[in-house]
């Protein structure tokens, strides 16, 4: 089963350190940002320690890794040309890094229309993706299902379908299905996941899903908040998330946890991924998980 989490990529070890961290959590795949998600400061490809990273991955059976584009990219912005241009240029650079790392998909938040309206935002995203996808490689951009916070685009399957339909090289577009976001956008992930998946299949096609973000939610369905919760401790619940993780449709797809670190003290929060992954492998909810994480 391809199950992992977001891990860090920093210091001198970079990808090697990411692979070691993923192995320590008992993962078979993982997701990284190529640098801080809040800025565009990046190391050169030569400094990402890719060869050693791949050696560690091979040693520990890690594969199908995923890259996440930084949050600052907003190619839906119609009001600031500099924001749009930065997004296009930086996304092209990120795709080059993604290919060098050996990942097939880079996850992208489609963007926010910042008041110009959904139609204008979607048209701008299509313009940006058509420009980005002229580069010659086989990396896919995985458009993420969004919660609908603020002016986010991608809160409905129809919005994502409109983007995909408008892009010329759309064989290089995939979808990252985020359980928390989709729940927060109003879909009944908790009680009728197969119904949600059937709807997705009719509108976009399930074969477009190449990454799944497995997150519980701190909010009720339809809240449009996007606040992740640990597996089984939120409004989606363990049973639904366990069902999704073991779903036949996602057997060969990386499933990535982005659940929050545990702990009241901001300086002493601990990653939950090792125990959350064990829990999902055993298919049995542990209500003591957060306490056990703090005792690690």
From Swiss-Prot:
Binding residues for Zn(2+) 3, per the UniProt record?
A: 181, 226, 228
Q: Which cofactor does it need?
A: Zn(2+)
One MF term from GO for this chain?
Answer: DNA-(apurinic or apyrimidinic site) endonuclease activity
Q: Where does Zn(2+) 2 bind?
A: 144, 178, 213, 258
Q: Where does Zn(2+) 1 bind?
A: 68, 109, 144
Question: Is DNA repair included in the keywords of this UniProt record?
Answer: yes
Name the chemical reaction catalysed here: Endonucleolytic cleavage to 5'-phosphooligonucleotide end-products
Q: Which domain of life is it from?
A: Bacteria
Q: What class of enzyme is it?
A: hydrolase
Q: Which Gene3D superfamilies match?
A: Divalent-metal-dependent TIM barrel enzymes (3.20.20.150)
- What's noted on cofactor binding? Binds 3 Zn(2+) ions.
Q: What is its EC number?
A: 3.1.21.2
Keywords associated with the record: DNA damage, DNA repair, Endonuclease, Hydrolase, Metal-binding, Nuclease, Zinc
The family database entries (Pfam families) matched by this protein are listed as:
AP_endonuc_2
Q: List the disulfide bonds.
A: none
Provide a GO biological process annotation.
base-excision repair
Q: Which family does it belong to?
A: Belongs to the AP endonuclease 2 family.
- Main role? Endonuclease IV plays a role in DNA repair. It cleaves phosphodiester bonds at apurinic or apyrimidinic (AP) sites, generating a 3'-hydroxyl group and a 5'-terminal sugar phosphate.
By what name is this protein known?
Probable endonuclease 4
The beginning of the lineage is: Bacteria, Bacillati, Bacillota, Bacilli, Bacillales
């Amino acid at each position: 089963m391809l199950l992992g989490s977001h891990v860090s990529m920093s210091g001198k070890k970079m990808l090697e350190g990411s692979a070691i961290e993923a192995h320590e959590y008992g993962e078979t795949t993982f997701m990284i940002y190529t640098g801080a998600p809040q800025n565009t400061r990046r190391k050169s490809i030569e400094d990402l320690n890719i060869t050693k990273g791949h050696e560690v991955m091979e040693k520990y059976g890690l594969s199908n890794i995923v890259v996440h584009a930084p949050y600052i990219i907003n190619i839906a912005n119609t009001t600031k040309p500099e924001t749009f241009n930065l997004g296009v240029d930086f996304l092209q650079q990120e795709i080059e890094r993604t290919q060098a790392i050996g990942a097939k998909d880079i996850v992208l938040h489609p963007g926010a229309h910042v008041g110009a309206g959904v139609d204008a935002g979607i048209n701008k995203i299509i313009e940006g993706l058509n420009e980005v996808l002229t580069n010659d490689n086989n990396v896919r951009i995985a458009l993420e299902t969004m919660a609908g916070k603020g002016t986010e685009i991608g809160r409905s399957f129809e919005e994502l379908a409109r983007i995909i339909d408008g892009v010329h090289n759309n064989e290089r577009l995939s979808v990252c299905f985020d359980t928390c976001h989709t729940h927060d956008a109003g879909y009944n992930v908790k009680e009728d996941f197969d119904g949600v998946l059937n709807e997705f299949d009719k509108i976009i096609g399930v074969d477009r899903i190449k990454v799944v973000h497995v997150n519980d939610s701190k909010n009720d369905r339809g809240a449009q908040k996007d606040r992740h919760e640990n597996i089984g401790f939120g409004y989606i619940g363990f049973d639904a998330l366990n069902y999704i993780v073991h779903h036949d449709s996602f057997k060969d797809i990386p499933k990535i946890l982005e659940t929050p670190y545990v702990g009241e003290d901001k300086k002493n929060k601990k990653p939950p991924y090792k125990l959350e992954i064990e829990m999902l492998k055993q298919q049995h909810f542990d209500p003591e998980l957060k306490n056990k994480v703090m005792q690690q």
